[in-house]
From Swiss-Prot:
This is Leucine--tRNA ligase. A motif ('HIGH' region) lies at residues 34-44. One of its GO terms (biological process) is leucyl-tRNA aminoacylation. CDD domains: Anticodon_Ia_Leu_BEm, LeuRS_core.
Length: 829
């Protein structure tokens, strides 16, 4: 009777094999693949279990499901490990993959392990090197200078996460902003398409689509030509508020705007060269103080007899629009703060109906135009159109659309990544590596103790012959951003070692169900959408969108604990201290994180309770897209449910797999109605990914089954209910379900059995409750047969309401089918 979960789970896992012929697949289920950090955590458990439930359910519906797994295996932690533990990143990564593979299998996930891939394998990244060469041909890849975080001690570029309080994570040196040549992909070529096609993603969360919409950031405005005094040049300025032009008091340009080459004052030139690039404002919500340098350049206002000074500022960037804006302090808060700081004019041109105080903040609402010459008296919308027309008429301005999104910088000065297949030759310039020489692989004999990029420091690897002229040349020593690998892996699963299979991709993509965290909304998910379009343009397949349905699971949270000194404690440490009577501060539930120590070891949970218990808890109570709080009582409750379920079914000795439910007593029919109603509900819940609701329903079914057994309901009806229960719990708690199926004599593996279909006849309600009303006021509820005719229903309602009607005249009787009867009366005068 005892449920030995360890024995059951180990036994069942040996029997599973979820191989799928990808060319025959009908449904593609994919979770965001993990970085092989070494251990699976609770967030992984939730992510992968949600996907596994969907995959198992779809298989049970007779659908050929493709459910692969792989490893996002390049990345900075492997280099950090190489430095800390004196181990090769390849070895560190492989060991972690081996460990995490065992952990994933222990959870009981129905993956097709035959399609397993790792992005650090040359057989994988040789294809993306080929993509890059094709992107070059199609004009989707290019090289230019861009700002990077530069560590002057280690002589290397740092990722943003490696800059801690403005200093390099390893050297402690103050990080500088430098311009270096970097490779870029032209995601901006698809900006309009990426934005517009969000409308067709009707199975994506609205929040994710809104985040992408804002990230792409379409801005419709006007480019205005300002004449620069004394140097016979014009400065193009972009604005989305042309109606405020009469309120302009200065021009703001990026620190690297080409017009600054016209500055002649040596002191100002020195100030510009010393410009603090570390405090650039790249986000409108930034709290970084706004500052500027008067360049000495002056432009002429196009409509007023006044000149505007040109400031070099930290809140305008060259890679957005024209790199120049005009400042209207009265109607833009950023400009207002800048004008206050530098004592610039603040001129109001938009006036609301109520007087406002411009002494504290800018006014950004609607109103009537004043102090604006030919715009006076107009509304804001009218003034915008009138100003655009005037600028066009004078030939000094025109409509323009820009996007906030920038081209994707893919160069990383790191070792553990995919080498960029480029060679630099003094004679031939930039030369792509020949396709026959792909893949360009990483050297294994690298030294991580030296500062700088290990590839750049390697004594031999970067020195090659030019493929064009045969002269001495050097390899590109940068590697791809790791988002490059994760932007196409969903297509790699559809291919072979020979590359992407065009026909299979066209058939199977987009992925039907994609599950992962919302934190990837504007990087991985957007880059993947771009990659589909880029690969389509290059002829690899014809797929616009990578993911049809997106499920963003919530975080797994846990209370935080700290001692009297504020030091964080692990949950087990906190428990022990509380048992000893020591004071422990209990904080609110937050996302599990190593830094706050509010983590629960998944291996410990599986060892103590089993995978099915962990799966059941993580799927219970909370919708998949909401955060879930880890509670010890919850995991204990899930464990007790499984033990009770096991005992109930194993102890029933009248099971009959050839049950006959035709001629059964009325009390048994009542139970069948309940069972089939729950089957219908669970099926609906699974179709709409209401997994927590489905769990609640099958637990309800367990209670009904327990009552049926206790009251000795017809054994055939009980047998049917047992078979149904075992089948519907399988996607959620597959080990115990599979073993129970085996114990009752089920043939073949349970996951191969079809999903139970609810008997529609049993779903028809025999009786319905009808609200009886008089003049719209509720009187009583009438319970009648579901198929009662209207005349009979009318008669019964009138009889029930006769005391209320009294001597009044019945004017009409309205029947709302299966819901209400409203008797309209008129009292006698």
């Amino acid at each position: 009777m005892h449920y030995d979960f360890k024995k059951v789970e180990q036994d069942i896992q040996k029997k599973w094999n979820f191989y799928t012929d990808v060319k025959k697949a009908q449904c593609y289920v994919l979770e965001m693949f993990p970085y092989p950090s070494g251990n699976i955590h609770m967030g992984h458990l939730r992510n992968y279990t949600i996907g596994d439930v969907i995959a198992r359910y779809k298989r049970a519906c007779g659908i050929n499901v493709f459910h692969p797994i792989g490893w996002d295996a390049f990345g900075l932690p492997a280099e950090n490990a190489a430095l800390s533990y004196n181990i090769n990143p390849q070895t560190w990564t492989k060991n972690n993959i081996d460990n995490m593979r065992c952990q994933l299998k222990s959870i009981g996930l129905s993956y097709d392990w035959n399609k397993e891939l790792a992005t650090c394998d040359a057989d994988y990244y040789k294809h993306e090197q080929a993509f890059f060469l094709d992107f070059l041909k199609c004009g989707l890849a290019y090289r230019k200078e861009s700002l990077v975080n530069w560590d002057p001690i280690d002589q290397t570029v740092l990722a943003n996460e490696q800059v801690i309080d403005g200093k390099g994570w390893r050297s402690g040196a103050v990080v500088e902003k430098r311009k270096l040549s970097q490779w870029f992909l032209k995601i901006t070529d698809f900006a309009e398409e990426l934005l517009n096609d969000l409308k067709v993603l009707d199975k994506w969360p609205e929040k994710v689509k809104l985040m992408q919409e804002r990230w792409i950031g379409r801005s419709e405005g006007v480019v205005v030509d300002f004449e620069i005094l004394n140097i016979n040049k014009t400065l193009q300025v972009f604005t989305t508020c042309p109606h405020t032009l009469f309120g302009a008091s200065f021009i703001a340009v990026s620190f690297d705007h080409p017009i600054l080459q016209c500055v002649s004052d040596s002191d100002i030139i020195q100030q510009i060269n010393d410009f603090d690039k570390n405090n650039l404002i790249t986000d409108a919500s930034s709290t970084v103080e706004k500052f500027g340098i008067n360049s000495g350049l002056v432009v002429k206002h196009p409509f007023l007899c006044m000149n505007l000074p040109v400031y070099v500022v930290n809140f305008v960037l060259m890679d957005y629009a024209t790199g120049a804006v005009f400042g209207c302090p009265a109607h833009d808060q950023r400009d207002f703060e800048f004008a206050k700081k530098y004592n610039l004019q603040i001129k109001q041109v938009v006036f609301p109906e109520i007087d406002i105080d411009l002494g504290k903040e800018a006014y950004v609402g609607s109103g009537t135009m004043k102090n604006s010459d030919f715009l006076d008296g107009m509304t804001v919308d009218e003034a915008k159109e009138a100003m655009i027309a005037k600028l066009q008429l004078l030939g000094i301005g025109d409509k323009m659309t820009y996007y906030r999104i920038h081209d994707w910088g893919i160069s990383r000065q790191r070792y553990w990544g995919c080498p960029i297949p480029i060679i630099y030759c003094e004679k031939c310039g930039t030369v792509p590596v020949s396709r026959k020489d792909l893949p360009v692989t990483l050297p294994q004999d690298v030294d991580f103790t030296k500062s700088g990029n290990p590839l750049d420091n390697h004594p031999t690897w970067k020195y090659v012959k030019c493929p064009s002229c045969g002269m001495d040349a050097e390899r590109e020593t940068d590697t791809f951003d790791t988002f490059f690998e994760s932007s196409w892996y969903f297509a790699a699963f559809c291919g072979t070692s020979s590359g992407i299979d065009k026909d299979t991709c066209n058939m199977l993509l987009p992925v039907d169900y994609y599950i992962g965290g919302i934190e990837h909304a504007v990087l991985h998910l957007l880059y993947s959408r771009f990659f589909c379009r880029a690969l389509t343009k290059c002829g690899y397949f014809n797929v616009k969108e990578p993911f049809s349905s997106l499920i963003t699971q919530g975080m797994v949270c846990h209370a935080t604990y700290s001692d009297a000194q504020g030091n964080y404690l692990f949950p087990e440490e906190a428990r022990k201290m509380m048992e000893e009577g020591q004071h422990v501060n209990v904080g609110r539930a937050e996302k599990m994180s190593k830094s706050k120590k509010n983590v629960v070891n998944l291996e410990y949970i599986i060892d103590k309770y089993g995978a099915d218990t962990a799966r059941l808890f993580i799927l219970s109570d909370t919708p998949p897209d909401r955060d879930i709080e880890w509670l010890d009582d919850g995991i204990e409750g899930a464990s007790k449910y499984l033990s009770k379920l096991w005992r109930m079914i194993v102890s029933y000795d009248q099971i009959n797999l050839n049950f006959n439910v035709e001629d059964i007593p009325e009390d048994a029919i009542k139970y069948r109605r309940c069972v089939h109603k729950i089957v219908s509900d669970i099926t609906s819940d699974l179709e709409f990914c209401r997994l927590n609701c489905a769990v609640a329903k099958f637990r309800e079914l367990s209670n009904i089954l327990s009552e049926m057994i206790r009251t000795s309901v017809n054994s055939d009806v009980v047998s049917e209910a047992i078979c149904i229960l075992i089948r519907v719990i399988e996607p959620f708690i597959p080990h115990i379900a599979e073993k129970l199926w085996e114990n009752i004599g089920g043939k073949d593996m349970l996951w191969n059995q079809m999903w139970p279909k609810a008997d529609t006849e049993l779903l028809i309600e025999r009786n319905v409750n009808i609200a009886v009303q008089v003049n719209g006021k509720f009187i009583r509820t009438l319970t009648v047969a579901n198929n009662i005719d209207n005349d009979q229903l009318k008669s019964m309602a009138l009889e029930m309401a006769k005391n209320k009607i009294g001597n009044s005249v019945v004017k009409n009787v309205y029947i709302i089918p299966k819901r209400a009867v409203n008797i309209v009366i008129e009292k006698l005068s």
